[in-house]
Swiss-Prot record:
Annotated HPr domain residues: 1-88
Species of the source: Latilactobacillus sakei
Active site (record annotation): H15
Keywords noted in UniProt: Cytoplasm, Phosphoprotein, Phosphotransferase system, Sugar transport, Transcription, Transcription regulation, Transport
Phosphoserine sites (modified residues): S46
Name listed for the protein in its UniProt record: Phosphocarrier protein HPr
PANTHER family: PHOSPHOCARRIER PROTEIN HPR, PHOSPHOCARRIER PROTEIN NPR
Gene name, Swiss-Prot/TrEMBL: ptsH
Amino acid sequence: MEKRDFHVVADTGIHARPATLLVQTASKFNSDVNLEYKGKSVNLKSIMGVMSLGVGQGADVTISAEGADEADAINAIEETMKKEGLSE
């Protein structure tokens, strides 16, 4: 299992558009990918799950992946988060 912590810096947090991009990125991989915030974990391949967390600016989140391509999944998600200005 791979895990990585992120600090959300975007003014709007993880709202609909970046959430969609994160879900699309996670969905490219066979690994189980989860987003954890405030003790609640959701499937990062589910837009409804991601939106239900209400991740705002300044939030600390953990993304984990488990499976054959877990490292690639985490790296791709980190790249998406940085590219979209969600984290540094």
